Amino acid sequence: MKSRGAGCSARLLLTVGWLLLAGLQSTCGINVTAIQDPSLAREGEGEPEGDEEPENDSETEKEPQAEAEDDSEGIGIREVILTSGCPGGESKCIVRVEECRGPVDCGWGRPISESLEHVRLACVHTSPENRFKYIWRLLRPDQQAIILANDSAILEVHRDTHPKAFECETLDNNEIVASIRFTIYTTTELQMKRASRPDTDAVLVFVLTIGVIICIFVIFVLIFIIINWTAVKDFWAKASTTEIQSELSSMRYKDSTSLDQSPTDIPGHEDDALSEWNE
């Protein structure tokens, strides 16, 4: 009985451990995606290429994610990965790294670094950085944009009393291959956003900690019940027997009380009947 209980508890521990590991991996995946370098471009979904490999070899493309809303925009670098036929028995291996392109409009991006005084912005580009030409513009509502003198991929902007919008175009051989825009908030707006933003990391850590504690407690309770199943069963049997006996005792008490009260009630009814007869 003990060996069977130990086997069940081991399987239960293994299952809960896998569930906790999956939850932590998903959380880490979200955090990694959020801090990727915005200088990487948005890239389109690549098609598998198998011209250089046998027909039974399948290739998939792994593309870096950029800071724009859609990861199929702009210009970037992708890795062509072979999923079968790799040397040394490896499940995956990189065949080559190549450049890929998607739609020119990359939407609104995020700064690569920012503080209360200044912000650093980055155009969409790939290595080497100097192979492209960059045009920065200051966007103005209902007015023509102002072309800035900066021609590098990085632009450092100081915060002003009013929010500003910037746009960067990446050109390759005088052809626009990517365009991305940024919004620079004022210091007051940034402080308000930071104050109103919930501390998701602290909440996530708290929830995970409570969940782990509850899971460990439940696991120990189940292990205790499985190992001491006979004692638990006897305890439940005694508890149910005691409850049944108490219910029977209460029923007997009620029956005895009703029997004691019934003889005193009968003479009263007889006297009432005789008085009515005499009248």
Curated annotation (Swiss-Prot):
It is a single-pass type I membrane protein. Residues 30-221 are extracellular. It is found in: Cytoplasmic vesicle, Secretory vesicle, Acrosome inner membrane. Residues 243-279 are cytoplasmic. GO terms for biological process: acrosome assembly. Keywords: Cytoplasmic vesicle, Glycoprotein, Membrane, Phosphoprotein, Signal, Transmembrane, Transmembrane helix. The modification Phosphoserine is found at residues 262, 275. Residues 46-58 have a biased composition (Acidic residues). CDD domains: SPACA1. GO terms for cellular component: acrosomal membrane; inner acrosomal membrane. Glycans are attached at residue 31. Residues 39-74, 253-279 are annotated as: Disordered. Residues 1-29 form the signal peptide. N-glycosylated. Its main location: membrane. Coiled coil: none annotated. The modification Phosphotyrosine is found at residue 253. The chain crosses the membrane at residues 222-242. Interacts with CYLC1; the interaction may be relevant for proper acrosome attachment to the nuclear envelope. Plays a role in acrosome expansion and establishment of normal sperm morphology during spermatogenesis. Important for male fertility. This is Sperm acrosome membrane-associated protein 1. It comes from Bos taurus (Bovine). The lineage of its organism: Eukaryota, Metazoa, Chordata, Craniata, Vertebrata.
